[in-house]
Structures are given as structure tokens and as C-alpha cells.
């Protein structure tokens, strides 16, 4: 039985946030097509994950050197391990998030920091870093109110580009990506843009 991990990084309701609607649409379509799959859903805002900083980094380093950890470090390292191992054990992963101020919401950056661990999702070699998580099937669902398809706007898109770059660093070089964009910039076509995008989401979910 496949293990599927759904990761949502938006705390706004679906009627107000397109990426939340994409997430709900994907999950419901997938569950309908795969009723016996083992599914885990992570709502990153609800989890309120501690920032990845000195305590977790020092704890991880000290553990790798066989040094004694403080209670705080033990807790931080255990939290990182929990989500890292969950990700590594998943056969399929879906990320859903908006573009806010040119990038992803902060909880997703924290979560990705937990996962990006040398020796786990990538390793260092003489020829440069090498990804270790390439066997996963991954879908990236992104929404952005403006149209970033132009030559002028494309470099400012640091949400989907950020996530797919990190995935590639981990060896996941072929994630399937569905983006809904421009629904705020083009209000006269907003409903059509969203509806067409959600149809794409359904198709991807049905065959995932």
C-alpha cells in the first residue's frame, strides 16, 4: 500500500484562497480514486512548527559527533527527525501553497529546513551535492494572484521555483506542477482561470 503525504501551507479558507481550494480539490479527488491508500495530511500553520535555528542545528551537529545534547536540543532534533522520517517514508508527496510577497509562507520554509538534511535527503560528494530522495512521486500545487509568465515578472516568482529547486537538490527532478495564476490581475477572467486550473488539479489527482 502506497503512503501518501499531503502538505498544505495556507491557513486561509478555500473560499478565499485558491491554493487552499486546489489542496481540497486534489485531496478529495485522490481519496475518491484511491480509497485504500494510507494518507497523512499536514497543515503546517496548525502544527506551529518551531523555527529551524541554532538549537536544532547545534543538536544535529552534536549528535553526529557523539556529543551530549541538552534537553532543548534533544526536543528540537526529535521534532526534525519526526517530519524528516515521515517524508522519507512516503511514496508520494503533494505540496500546496500560495505565493505571498514573492515567496512561500514561512511555515513551509521551516518545514523544508527540517527535511533538507545532509545524509538523508542529499549527500556531499567530490563532484558536488547529490540528491537521495529521487524515488518519490511529487506534485506541486501553487497559486499566485498575479501573472508571472512574462519575462519581466518570471524572476520574481520565488515560490514554485523555490520548492522545485529544493526538490531537485534532493534528487526529485520531475515533480508534476499545477499553477493557477492571474486570477487577481485579470478580474474579468478570474472565475474562468480558477475553474480551468481546478480541472487540471482533478486530472492530476485522478492519475497520481
Curated annotation (Swiss-Prot):
UniProt protein name: FMN-dependent NADH:quinone oxidoreductase 2
InterPro entries referenced in this protein's UniProt entry, alphabetically: Flavodoxin_fold, Flavoprotein-like_sf, FMN-dep_NADH:Q_OxRdtase_AzoR1, NADH:quinone_OxRdtase_FMN_depd
Primary role: Quinone reductase that provides resistance to thiol-specific stress caused by electrophilic quinones. Also exhibits azoreductase activity. Catalyzes the reductive cleavage of the azo bond in aromatic azo compounds to the corresponding amines.
Gene Ontology molecular-function annotations: electron transfer activity; FMN binding; oxidoreductase activity, acting on NAD(P)H as acceptor; oxidoreductase activity, acting on NAD(P)H, quinone or similar compound as acceptor
Keyword terms, alphabetized: Flavoprotein, FMN, NAD, Oxidoreductase
Enzyme class: oxidoreductase
Pfam families in the record: Flavodoxin_2
Regions that span the bilayer: none
HAMAP family tied to this protein: Azoreductase_type1
Catalytic function, reaction form: 2 a quinone + NADH + H(+) = 2 a 1,4-benzosemiquinone + NAD(+); N,N-dimethyl-1,4-phenylenediamine + anthranilate + 2 NAD(+) = 2-(4-dimethylaminophenyl)diazenylbenzoate + 2 NADH + 2 H(+)
Subunit structure: Homodimer.
Signal peptide coordinates: none
Cofactor note: Binds 1 FMN per subunit.
Family of this protein: Belongs to the azoreductase type 1 family.
EC number: 1.6.5.-, 1.7.1.17
GN (gene name): azoR2
Cofactors named for this entry: FMN
Amino acid at each position: 500500500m502506497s503512503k501518501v503525504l499531503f502538505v498544505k501551507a495556507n491557513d486561509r479558507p478555500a473560499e478565499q484562497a485558491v491554493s487552499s481550494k486546489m489542496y481540497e480539490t486534489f485531496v478529495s479527488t485522490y481519496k475518491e480514486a484511491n480509497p485504500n491508500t494510507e494518507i497523512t495530511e499536514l497543515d503546517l500553520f496548525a502544527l506551529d512548527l518551531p523555527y529551524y535555528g541554532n538549537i536544532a542545528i547545534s543538536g544535529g551537529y552534536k549528535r553526529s559527533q557523539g556529543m551530549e545534547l541538552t534537553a532543548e536540543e534533544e526536543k528540537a532534533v526529535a521534532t526534525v527527525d519526526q517530519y524528516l522520517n515521515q517524508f522519507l517514508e512516503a511514496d508520494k508527496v503533494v505540496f500546496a501553497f500560495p505565493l505571498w510577497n514573492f515567496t512561500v509562507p514561512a511555515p513551509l520554509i521551516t518545514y523544508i529546513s527540517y527535511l533538507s538534511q545532509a545524509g538523508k535527503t542529499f549527500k556531499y560528494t567530490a563532484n558536488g551535492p547529490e540528491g537521495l530522495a529521487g524515488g518519490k512521486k511529487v506534485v506541486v500545487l501553487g497559486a499566485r494572484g498575479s501573472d508571472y509568465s512574462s519575462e519581466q515578472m518570471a524572476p520574481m516568482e520565488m515560490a514554485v521555483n523555490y520548492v522545485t529547486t529544493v526538490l531537485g537538490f534532493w534528487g526529485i527532478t520531475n515533480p508534476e506542477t499545477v499553477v493557477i495564476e492571474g486570477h487577481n490581475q485579470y478580474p474579468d477572467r478570474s472565475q474562468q482561470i480558477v475553474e480551468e486550473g481546478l480541472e487540471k488539479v482533478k486530472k492530476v489527482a485522478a492519475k497520481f
